[in-house]
Amino acid sequence: MHVIAVDAMGGDNAPQAIVEGVNQALAEFKDIEIQLYGDEAKIKNYLTANERVSIVHTDEKINSDDEPVKAIRKKKKASMVLGAQAVKEKAADAVISAGNTGALLAAGLFVVGRIKGVERPGLMSTMPSFTGQPFDMLDLGANAENTANHLHQYAILGSFYAKNVRGIATPRVGLLNNGTEKTKGDSLRKEAFELLSKEASINFIGNVEAREIMSGAADVVVADGFTGNAVLKAIEGTGLGTMKTLKSAIMNGGLKAKLGAFLLKDRLKGMKETMDYSSAGGAVLFGLKAPVVKCHGSSDAKAVYYTIKQVRKMLDTKVVEQLVDAFDPKEEVN
Amino acid sequence: MHVIAVDAMGGDNAPQAIVEGVNQALAEFKDIEIQLYGDEAKIKNYLTANERVSIVHTDEKINSDDEPVKAIRKKKKASMVLGAQAVKEKAADAVISAGNTGALLAAGLFVVGRIKGVERPGLMSTMPSFTGQPFDMLDLGANAENTANHLHQYAILGSFYAKNVRGIATPRVGLLNNGTEKTKGDSLRKEAFELLSKEASINFIGNVEAREIMSGAADVVVADGFTGNAVLKAIEGTGLGTMKTLKSAIMNGGLKAKLGAFLLKDRLKGMKETMDYSSAGGAVLFGLKAPVVKCHGSSDAKAVYYTIKQVRKMLDTKVVEQLVDAFDPKEEVN
């Protein structure tokens, strides 16, 4: 039985979307048990599952504008913090929240804790591509600054994830750089390139450019947290902006445009589904002693369900335990 | 009279697109004179203008896969190098090429030369936004590594450009960062934020995120070359990929989808025009003693025409001379 702690109070649609996602997941997966942290009365309004589920009541919660580190230190009874605490005390195997990202990162680092040997856990998401074949990218912004050694570790972390959770036998690992030639980049990239080239446990395919990552250039894309965050946001901003512009072009285009859009509806929907990656689950703060996963703040019940499914897969495949072994200093060849 | 040196042999559609663009520009602007560098016989195939134009024949040219610095050192008679040389010798006021970007940057730095006081010229483009109001961004990758002082200079450079060439009275200058709060970012960003906050000659509006830059967050976006390059490529990859996916959804969607697309044609075209920024001209290696401007490698005659128009505006407004004054150490307050 996998025990998953869920922060019922985090995100724009909490607790309804969270609890409904939990209902769905409990109905489908018989090998999971859910602990819901939050306002008991409010949770009960939506909870239909009655097996393998418990509520841990608390009035306290972390708000989206709370200062992350301060919040997890001061609000010891917040739903998110109690969930992380349960993982620390081995009462739960993993924790999920759709709340304040920074606070969840802080709870992950300071409450759940790093795997021994992992210097700086990275935030990793499975991102969509135009080819229909998603890719994992990290660090997406857990760190503002990274060293080449961190990037080296991200390559190993991402490769483990793609292999275990996404079932890719030999994930192609690429280093995000400003050109594909091996001599490209700043000193950080040059140093990281050397380290990745020598790393026998991964399939390093060299540098990849931000223009190509959404067209299947690699299965795992390694970036420092600053650049990874900027690229993620550039992709989001461009994608959302394009869709919004298309929509307003249709809405302001009169009857002809509306009829055209109606005829194209199925195709646009199919396109949207290709680009929708909520089925891949949430963003993992990877390199911690247990899965700590962030659902998007605007998650609906489906997205919560998929994140639970993702966490279950992480627990099933024991990807974290494998990482603990891989990073154990005793195992190091050097 | 503004004398503009044009590399007739650079880019995918050279020399035809280049020469046709020159024909258009010469017909419209009576105050410019063009020097075309390249294969005289081939140029003459397309040249219809016969006033204020001259051809400087050379057999040599820089290829797209030539190693930039080596190429400009070894191929002294290459069309691009001769154009830059003409600027150095004051025989021309500016140089334009659609050829090898790295080689043009090298020719700019080593042949034309930096403005005294500008440490690292930056590559700057006027980029489209969903609001229809474009923005200037630099450095887009002339440098793999930058210091806070370089970013400080980019803010001044970009502001001068937006003011003079784009006619924005008080350009809003934003620092590309991983959050909008002033405490965000790595040490480079924090240091740059301090410098920009104290810079009286610009209208610094604080940090901007990559998600918002295409929605009108700032008129000038300041980035280090590595991040700027990655964000530019992420925007390009997402934009092109979305359009390609939309196209193939329509093409494979049968008669219904094709009819829908037909009805939407005008609207999609309008949208494409909003996002098309070739009318803003090429990418300027800004901070040099004269305008050195890169047209996109795939430029058609229209894009070449617009780049000549842009360079003419730069010469008309004397933006480079103003920069020379602004960066003159004698003028510094400190």
Swiss-Prot record, chains A, B:
InterPro entries: FA_synthesis, Phospholipid_synth_PlsX-like
Subcellular compartments: Cytoplasm
Origin: domain of life: Bacteria
Swiss-Prot/TrEMBL catalytic activity: a fatty acyl-[ACP] + phosphate = an acyl phosphate + holo-[ACP]
EC id: 2.3.1.274
Molecular function GO terms recorded: phosphate:acyl-[acyl carrier protein] acyltransferase activity
Cellular component GO terms, alphabetical: cytoplasm
Primary location: cytoplasm
Tagged with keyword Lipid biosynthesis: yes
GO biological process: fatty acid biosynthetic process; phospholipid biosynthetic process
Quaternary structure, from the entry: Homodimer. Probably interacts with PlsY.
Family label: Belongs to the PlsX family.
Function according to Swiss-Prot or TrEMBL: Catalyzes the reversible formation of acyl-phosphate (acyl-PO(4)) from acyl-[acyl-carrier-protein] (acyl-ACP). This enzyme utilizes acyl-ACP as fatty acyl donor, but not acyl-CoA.
Name the UniProt record assigns to this protein: Phosphate acyltransferase
